[in-house]
């Protein structure tokens, strides 16, 4: 080392010593200033005594992770993430002129180092994933909690395994048989009784932190605020039901408002205000989490608020997050305006709030018309049943519609139309006075079609033949006559024999046309039918025309020709004298052979039929015993239907249980300032006279008469009216619905009916129980 280098190092050492000495002097001066300022502050005025509740930071040990451990880890991570410099980088930084690589070479060197680091990190990540998979297969653990800044995933390591329990055998078998979604286990904390999934604090740790502190339930918050010892530590816990939007104070500081509830019985809520550091730390907390609050400050409850109490905190150390609530939910019913109901319910008890549970219970019942409030079909249906079809009830009066009358012209038109559609003709006896037939002795004269008279059917009479149509008909008749004459001449020219035969037959057939008129039976008189033979439809032309062909002679001639042709081909053979064919013995022998043949064939046929019957029966049995290859799907569908049926019954029973445990419910009441009464609705007189009305929040209570069991509702502590049934005043609290009881018959049997103590008295169910004892 040369002298120049030694002198440089000595100079640098002297400069560093001077800098350290200056820093010590400045630090001593600052310490003196701070001590003097504290002494000046301690001198003036006496201390002001402000009542303040004691804060214990040990309650929130679960959250010291974010304030102490987390910053230290972040610092260590920042130190670790600083780039490590090797010898070449150090030389480049210290000796810029003597660097090893140029810009291009240093860039390549950095990329190579990054690739090496990435390869190492991927290898480590792969090994960690393999270890995690092995641990997941070995140990069954609850899923990770919700991600939010106040219960990070890293805190899972601090939670003990006391909440974790092995699943039952049935659940394990079901999980292996069916690939369904994993169901999170439900846990109940031993102090507050809240049901949770994914708990963040173990039961032992919670009991340890609650030593010396009093858990206050929601039902006793009001009493504890008014008469309890607030100097001692007390804790209230519940589920975060809702969060109102962030607001600002008069000074401009933001604050949050939460609603907490324990979801038991009648769902009660409290308001929790978060100020200052509590708002800054917890404003992102998700809804549905179970919280425990230590020693909150008490606010005065706002008038008209439905909350049990109003509390506030200003430090996040007073809040402990227990886990995700299992029971929190909203009502599944729909309001009258079509919007979804937003009331908070306990899903374990029932899916509907107290305002809609009775309505849904009626819908779910099979005979919903009997479960309705009116227990009937309604006044409109009753009115429609009593009144007729032509009666209308309007404005307190009954109006009857006048039936429509048909005119005489319309009646005749309809009668003619019906008779025309039926095809009735005018009776041939309609021209006589008494509609009787006149005997026809003379032969009917042959007149042309156009000149015929007499009765004509209505269908034919309805159509008026024009002159042109008549001319065409006459021309057709003339042509037919000429054709007939020409045919007769041709037939006479063919042969006298055939012509003479035809002539005789035509002469014999001529009088057959003029047959006597068939007598009309008495039962067919005065009918629109025609029984006259002359009115039967015939072809126009000569009535004496007939045409016959002798077919038999031609067939005989053809048979003779065929026989002669056969004899020419092969002459007749001589008869065998020894042949018995055709004799009596031959016939008997043939008959015996046929009988044997048919009897054997019948036996064989019977055997075949029996075999076929057996085969058919066996086939039918196989068909009936055959099963589908998809029987497992059928069984699965049956199980699903059965499960759906029982789930419906369970929901119905849950609704019934909720109504049986509901003795009052919030409602709106009307106060008339003139008549001085409070009721569910205003009377008609107040509405007509427009009295000033005031609508207030009230509670609807249910009562039952001890004497007759009649039920009533009121907005007061007790009903102010007597029983409408028995005129008694002995009331007792009851549930929203009447409890169903199984009667054995002894409770309702009364041989002589309901007894009356005096005239006009109706003792609802007076029972004498006049039963005959059983004979031994």
Curated annotation (Swiss-Prot):
Keyword set, alphabetical order: DNA replication, Metal-binding, Nucleus, Phosphoprotein, Zinc, Zinc-finger
Sites of Phosphoserine modification: 87-88
Record's function text: Proposed to be involved in DNA replication and to participate in the activation of the pre-replication complex (pre-RC). May be involved in chromosome condensation.
Name of this chain's protein: Protein MCM10 homolog
Subcellular location, principal: nucleus
GO MF entry, a single one: zinc ion binding
Gene coding for it: Mcm10
Zinc finger-like: region residues: 331-356
């Amino acid at each position: 080392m040369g002298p120049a280098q030694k002198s440089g190092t000595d100079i640098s050492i002297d400069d560093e010593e001077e800098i350290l000495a200056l820093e010590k002097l400045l630090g001593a001066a600052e310490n003196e200033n701070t001590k003097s300022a504290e002494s000046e502050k301690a001198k003036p005025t006496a201390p002001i005594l402000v009542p303040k509740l004691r804060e214990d930071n040990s309650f929130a040990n679960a959250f010291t992770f974010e304030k102490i451990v987390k910053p230290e880890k972040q610092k260590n991570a920042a130190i670790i993430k600083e780039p490590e410099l090797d010898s070449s980088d150090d030389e480049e930084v210290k000796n810029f002129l003597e660097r090893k690589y140029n810009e291009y070479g240093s860039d390549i060197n950095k990329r190579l180092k990054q690739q090496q680091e990435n390869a190492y990190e991927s290898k480590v990540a792969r090994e960690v994933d393999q270890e995690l998979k092995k641990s997941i297969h070995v140990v069954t653990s609850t899923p990770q909690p919700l991600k939010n800044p106040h219960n990070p995933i890293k805190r899972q390591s601090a939670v003990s395994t006391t909440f974790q329990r092995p699943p039952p055998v049935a659940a394990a078998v079901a999980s292996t048989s069916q690939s369904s979604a994993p169901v999170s286990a439900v846990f109940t904390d031993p102090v507050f009784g809240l049901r949770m999934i994914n708990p963040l604090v173990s039961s032992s740790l919670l009991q340890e932190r609650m030593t010396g502190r009093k858990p206050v339930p929601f039902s006793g918050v009001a009493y504890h605020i008014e008469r309890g010892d607030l100097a001692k530590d007390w804790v209230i816990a519940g589920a975060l039901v809702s969060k109102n939007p962030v607001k600002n104070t008069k000074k401009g500081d933001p604050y949050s408002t939460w609603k907490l509830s324990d979801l038991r019985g009648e769902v009660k809520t409290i308001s929790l205000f978060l100020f200052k550091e509590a708002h800054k730390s917890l404003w992102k907390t998700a809804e549905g989490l179970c919280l425990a609050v230590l020693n909150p400050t008490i606010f005065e409850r706002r008038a008209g608020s439905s909350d049990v109490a109003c509390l506030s905190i200003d430090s996040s150390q007073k809040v402990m997050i227990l886990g995700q609530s299992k029971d929190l939910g909203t009502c599944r019913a729909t309001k009258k305006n079509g919007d979804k109901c937003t009331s908070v319910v306990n899903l374990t008890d029932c899916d509907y709030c107290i305002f809609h549970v009775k309505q849904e219970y009626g819908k779910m019942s099979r005979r919903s018309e009997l479960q309705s409030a009116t227990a009937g079909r309604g006044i409109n249906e009753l009115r429609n049943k009593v009144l007729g079809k032509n009666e209308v009830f309007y404005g307190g009066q009954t109006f009857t519609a006048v039936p429509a009358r048909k005119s005489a012209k319309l009646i005749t038109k309809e009668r003619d139309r019906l008779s025309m559609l039926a095809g009735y003709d005018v009776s041939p006896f309609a021209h006589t006075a008494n509609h009787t037939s006149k005997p026809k002795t003379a032969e009917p004269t042959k007149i042309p079609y156009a000149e015929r008279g007499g009765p004509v059917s209505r269908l034919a009479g309805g159509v008026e033949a024009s002159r042109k149509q008549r001319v065409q008909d006459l021309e057709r008749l003339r042509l037919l006559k000429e054709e007939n004459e020409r045919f007769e001449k041709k037939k006479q020219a063919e042969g006298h024999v055939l012509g003479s035969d035809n002539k005789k037959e035509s002469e014999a057939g001529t009088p057959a046309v003029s047959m006597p008129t068939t007598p009309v039976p008495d039962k067919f008189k005065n009918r629109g039918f025609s029984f006259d033979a002359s009115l039967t439809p015939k072809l126009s032309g000569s009535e004496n025309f007939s045409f016959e062909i002798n077919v038999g002679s031609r067939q005989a001639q053809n048979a003779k020709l065929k026989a002669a042709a056969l004899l020419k081909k092969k002459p007749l053979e001589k008869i065998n004298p020894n042949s018995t064919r055709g004799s009596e013995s031959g016939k008997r022998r043939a008959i015996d052979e046929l009988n044997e043949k048919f009897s054997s064939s019948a036996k064989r046929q019977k055997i075949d039929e029996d075999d076929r019957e057996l085969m058919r029966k066996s086939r039918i049995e196989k068909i009936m015993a055959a099963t589908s290859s998809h029987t497992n799907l059928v069984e699965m569908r049956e199980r699903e239907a059965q499960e759906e049926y029982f789930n419906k019954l369970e929901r119905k029973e849950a609704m019934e249980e909720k109504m049986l445990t509901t003795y009052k419910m919030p409602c709106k009441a009307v106060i008339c300032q003139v008549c001085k009464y409070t009721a569910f609705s205003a009377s008609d007189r107040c509405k007509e006279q427009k009295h000033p009305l005031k609508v207030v929040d009230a509670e609807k209570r249910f009562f039952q008469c001890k004497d007759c069991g009649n039920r009533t509702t009121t907005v007061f502590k007790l009903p102010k009216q007597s029983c409408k049934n028995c005129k008694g005043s002995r009331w007792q609290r009851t549930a929203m619905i009447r409890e169903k009881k199984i009667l054995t018959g002894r409770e309702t049997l009364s041989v002589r009916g309901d007894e009356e103590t005096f005239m006009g008295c109706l003792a609802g169910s007076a029972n004498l129980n006049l039963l005959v004892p059983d004979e031994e």
